[in-house]
Amino acid sequence: MIFSILEHILTHISFSVVSIVLTIYFLTLLVNLDEIIGFFDSLDKGIIITFFGITGLLFTRWIYSGHFPLSNLYESLIFLSWAFSIIHMVSYFNKKQQNHLNAITAPSAIFIQGFATSGLLNKMPQSAILVPALQSQWLMMHVSLMILGYGALLCGSLLSIALLVITFRKVGPTFWKKNIKKNFLLNELFSFDVLYYINERNSILLQQNITFSFSKNYYRYQLIQQLDYWSFRIISLGFIFLTVGILSGAVWANETWGSYWNWDPKETWAFITWTIFAIYLHIKTNRNVRGINSAIVASIGFLLIWICYFGVILLGIGLHSYGSFTSN
C-alpha cells in the first residue's frame, strides 16, 4: 500500500514538473525572456527533477514487484520517458555545444508519460508475476537496451525531421528551380550594384536590411548545423544500444526457444529498423549525399520505430506479445 501511494506521488510530481517546463518553454516562443538570468537553466533543472522523479518511480515499482519494471507496456513507456530525460541531461551537461533538445525531449517525455498513465492503460499499472519466458537475467539487459535505443533513435529522428522543416522553409518555393544558385549570385551582385548607385541615406538603410537578412540566415544555418550535429550523435548512440539489444535478445531467444532468430514480427521489424539506421550512418560517411538525404532516411526510421514498438502490442501476435493490449 505504501509503495502504491509513493508510486502515485512520484508519477504526479514528474508529470506535473515536465508539464510546467513544457508550457513555460513554449511561452518563451511568444515572449522574450532571454533577459531573465538563469531562466533557461531553470527549465533544464526542471527536466532533471523529472528524471529523478521517474527514477524513483521505477525503483519503487522494482522493489515491490520483485523484478525489473519492464514486463508490460506501461512500464516500458515509463522507461522510455526516463530515456528521454537522460538524453536531455547528457546534452545539458555538455556545455561545449548550445542545443535546443528540450524542445524535443520535454514534449516527448510528457506525451509518453501521459499516454502511459491515461485510461487506455488502466489495467497495465498493476504489477503482476512474470510469465516463465520473462523470468531470466536477460530481461534487464535486453529490454532496457532496446528501449534506450528506441528513445535515442526517436530523439535523433525528431531532430532530423526538424532539420527538414527548417531547411525546406528556408528554401521556399524556389527549391525546385534548377538555376537557384545562379539566381542567388545575380541577386547578390544586384544588391551590391544598388549600393553604389543610391544616395548615402538609402545606402545606410539598405546595408542595415542586408545585415539583418544575413544575420537571420546565419542563425538558421547555425541551427541546422546544431540539429545535424546532435541528430547524428544521438542516432549513433541509439544504434549501438539497438545493436547490442538485438544481439542480447538473440542469445536470450536461444536459451528460451532454442533458436537465435525466429523471424517473429517483432524481430523482423527490429531488423528493418536496424537496417534503415545503418543506411543513415552509411550516408553520413559520404559527404556528397549527406544532409537532407540522411535526414529523410532518419524520418523514415522514426515511423519504423513506432511500428516496431507498437506493432506487436496492438496486434497481440508473435512471441513478443507479452503485456500487449490484447493479452491478459
Swiss-Prot record:
Function: Required during biogenesis of c-type cytochromes (cytochrome c6 and cytochrome f) at the step of heme attachment.
Topology versus the membrane: Multi-pass membrane protein
Superkingdom to which the source organism belongs: Eukaryota
TM ranges: 13-33, 46-66, 73-93, 101-121, 146-166, 234-254, 263-283, 295-315
Compartment(s) of residence: Plastid, Chloroplast thylakoid membrane
Organism: Crucihimalaya wallichii
GO cellular component, one term: plasma membrane
Pfam families per record: Cytochrom_C_asm (PF01578)
GO molecular function: heme binding
NCBIfam families: cytochr_II_ccsB (TIGR03144)
Family, similarity comment: Belongs to the CcmF/CycK/Ccl1/NrfE/CcsA family.
Record's protein name: Cytochrome c biogenesis protein CcsA
Gene designation per UniProt: ccsA
Swiss-Prot/TrEMBL keywords: Chloroplast, Cytochrome c-type biogenesis, Membrane, Plastid, Thylakoid, Transmembrane, Transmembrane helix
Gene Ontology annotations of biological process type: cytochrome complex assembly
